[in-house]
Design a protein with these regions (language model features):
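Catalytic Walker B motif of ABC-type/P-loop ATPase nucleotide-binding domains
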Residues: 148-152
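Helix N-cap at the start of a conserved alpha-helix in ABC-type nucleotide-binding domains
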Residues: 159-163
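Helix-to-loop junction immediately C-terminal to a conserved catalytic motif
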Residues: 56
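The feature captures the beta-strand-to-loop junction immediately N-terminal to the Walker
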Residues: 41-43
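Conserved ABC ATPase signature
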Residues: 123-127, 131
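Conserved catalytic motifs of ABC-family nucleotide-binding domains
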Residues: 144
């Protein structure tokens, strides 16, 4: 594994309901390297998105610890299932507004990498779902993230569009490699994108199996 950037140890995580506490996560121990893509694969409702929210510091109500390995919390780029683009801004403006300091050259490079250059002046309402998702991926990269959180970014896309979007995501990642946690139901998708896969069980969720993806499938990870 590359230099580790985070270690997440969860003892338990529950949600409060009218009927009492609902256990969601059991004992989980996840480590992530600086240039590593780790996929979280499991059934609906098993807490995959909750894990991402904990790593993204959006949910701090759990028993356990999130350790950034001696460093400050990194810059995190997040891609949700819904693109959440600003509808009154163009594609390019959505990227520029996300940046800490406007960097038009980086924005344009990402639009090219994700096959969106021809749509830089388009508004989100004119885009297909697949294109809007790619804009969201470009926006996540535009902050120069040290960690990407990808919450089923290709769900509901037709197979051809999903395959093309995965290819373009890897193109962008190879140009700016960073750590990433990917949530997906699709084991084939996980094997294409990740170099480790964590198979999650039913609630209260634990890691059932860790699968190392052969480097021949991910030559970009080879030294």
């Amino acid at each position: 594994m590359a230099e580790m950037i985070l270690r997440l140890r969860i003892e338990s995580k529950s949600f409060s309901t009218d009927r009492g506490e609902l256990p969601v996560l059991g004992r989980i121990d996840i480590a992530l390297g600086a240039r590593e893509i780790v996929a979280l694969v499991g059934p609906s409702g098993c807490g995959k998105t909750t894990l991402l929210r904990i790593v993204g510091n959006l949910d701090t109500d759990f028993q356990g610890a999130l350790d950034w390995c001696g460093a400050a919390m990194p810059r995190i780029g997040t891609v949700f299932q819904e693109p959440r683009l600003l509808p009154w801004r163009t594609v390019r403006q959505n990227l520029l507004l996300a940046q800490r300091t406007e960097d038009p050259e980086l924005a344009d490079a990402l639009l090219r990498a994700l096959d969106l250059a021809a749509f830089s002046d388009a508004f989100p309402s004119t885009l297909s779902l697949g294109m809007a998702r790619r804009v969201a991926i470009a926006r996540a990269f535009t902050i120069d993230p040290q960690l990407l959180l990808l919450d089923e970014p290709f769900v509901s896309l037709d197979p051809a569009m999903a395959a093309r979007s995965r290819e373009l995501l890897l193109n962008a990642w190879r140009a700016r490699p960073t750590a990433a946690l990917l949530v997906t139901h699709d084991r084939a998708e996980a094997a294409e994108l990740a170099d480790r896969i964590l198979l999650l069980g039913e609630r209260p969720t634990q890691v059932l199996q860790e699968i190392i993806v052969p480097q021949v499938r991910r030559p970009d990870l080879m030294p």
